[in-house]
């Protein structure tokens, strides 16, 4: 039992229950049929308790659909369904058939009467409506017209057996296909005179019926089985009656057939060709572009085959057009493929353009359709999200500066709208560590070109495009990011790479002042090697040496030697301590404070004094600091992944050349300066020795007979003047250790 029978059974059972006075107590329903539920319709409850309805069926169905929120459209005169044998039944009276109840062909619908009692109480619309359609043998389709939901009501296809008298079932089918169907075309690629391929479209000689019409030839019973709605069935029957006739003046033998041939070229030429080549055939003009050919089967078949070779349609010139898509190119391509199968559509990469090849008339129709349906896609408003990143190791302000430089670049396209793939690049994070981040491929452009492209992109940026906002909270060391989800996701990907643990460098510094005699007592050959004490002299930077403590027992050990010289008074320990720096650490000086030569150093060791000068000015007092004595500064500490330490060290020995008094400020101050600086690289735990910072001290002593030694001219004969010059050299011993 199919769905239709089940629905009919449900309707009959419901009506029988409504009209029954009493129900026998012995009746048992063995099977309960489930009413079909259409998921495309609404399940809103409807009530139709009208008793015996005698009004027009169209009004009844429209009111039910309207109560559920639908509009209705009828494909035919649905009120003619109440006709019985050409009469309209209203209660006990009978009215004559009028033209208002006829089909478009002028023939009334002769359908059996249907029940007119309707009793639905709070029934779901998607169950009641399919039941009504099945009871009245109707078909429906849900369509969208603007913002309204419309139910399109039509006749359910019916089957008709049409007997034939004079022509065969195959001939009748061929004529029906040519008359009611559409000719099929094929695309052929040929070569022109320049041996270049070009595309042409030509008919295949075959025809296809619409999907609503099915015709099957029954040759054994000489009839046609037709499946269609009533309107199409009547049209097909009328057409067959027109061609199923005996030819006047000649009796068609039992082996004779009749064919309908649709002319492709000139009709007069084909007609004359058939009359000259096949005089035994009867050829008559049929419709606007067809010929009816009757005669012996073999002659008709040979004529049809020969016409397929000589009857050619005129060549349709292929025209090419370029169309620029406003919306989505994929959607427009799919639309053209569905509406115009013979039209060749070729997308041009990502440019949003389509190349259309086809007949001029077809192209004009397609372009007119695109002008109506191709609209720019609505621009979705960008959604703004916010996220807080808690930093553990890096400074929020430094990470903010790094991210702002990254997000300032357009990561999607350059000025030519070409997609730029991201490439991994080794960079330095906010703490000076080496890290790998993804940045746009610059494609070899110069900095000036990049700046010009960035300005052009900024000018072309839509109004609804916003830049990400980054706020550094110094108190909690947090980074607040506000922007689109894509921008926040990009920041979330970069933050873990920047917020990493930074290794520290512990530098043990020992500064030893050795006089000239002590240096001679050391007996060092500055070009020799003593075990693990590798010595080298570089011009202008003093003495640089690398000491390996693990090999100290095999050669010379500097630390016990310096200690022994201290006990003899030949050397003096100026500084012995350690400082700790972070890898990549920048200056420790506060912005806007006093400035001196060590302002940009990551760490400093000083032994001596400081001269502060306050210079008044219109913008405010300017404070300058001059450190004298011994100054040791460390710049740009860096720890490589393999543990290698790189430092830039600068050592200075400054001494005032003249005594500084209050009257000499703020005039020119004269200092003697001895300076050495170098960038050194050594392994974890190794020791570096720097030497060559010379200092010179001159001491003058006067002695003699009091009063007489101070007389001018002859005073030198009664006294003594002793001048002693002492030169000393500073040794700086540095041992670096990586602390993680």
Curated annotation (Swiss-Prot):
**InterPro entries, per the entry:** Bact_Secretion_Sys_Channel, NolW-like, NolW-like_sf, T2SS/T3SS_dom
**Keywords, ordered alphabetically:** Signal
The keyword Iron-sulfur appears for this protein: no
Which GO BP terms apply?
protein secretion
Primary place of residence? other
UniProt cross-references to Pfam families, sorted A to Z = Secretin, Secretin_N
**A GO CC term assigned to this protein in UniProt:** type II protein secretion system complex
The signal sequence is 1-20
The compartments listed are:
Cell envelope
The reply on keyword Signal is yes
The entry sums up its family as follows: Belongs to the bacterial secretin family.
What this protein is reported to do is described as: Could be part of the type IV piliation system (T4P). May contribute at the cohesion between the S-layer and the outer membrane by forming oligomers. Could also be the main channel through which trafficking is managed.
**What protein name is recorded for this chain?**
Probable type IV piliation system protein DR_0774
- State the species of origin: Deinococcus radiodurans (strain ATCC 13939 / DSM 20539 / JCM 16871 / CCUG 27074 / LMG 4051 / NBRC 15346 / NCIMB 9279 / VKM B-1422 / R1)
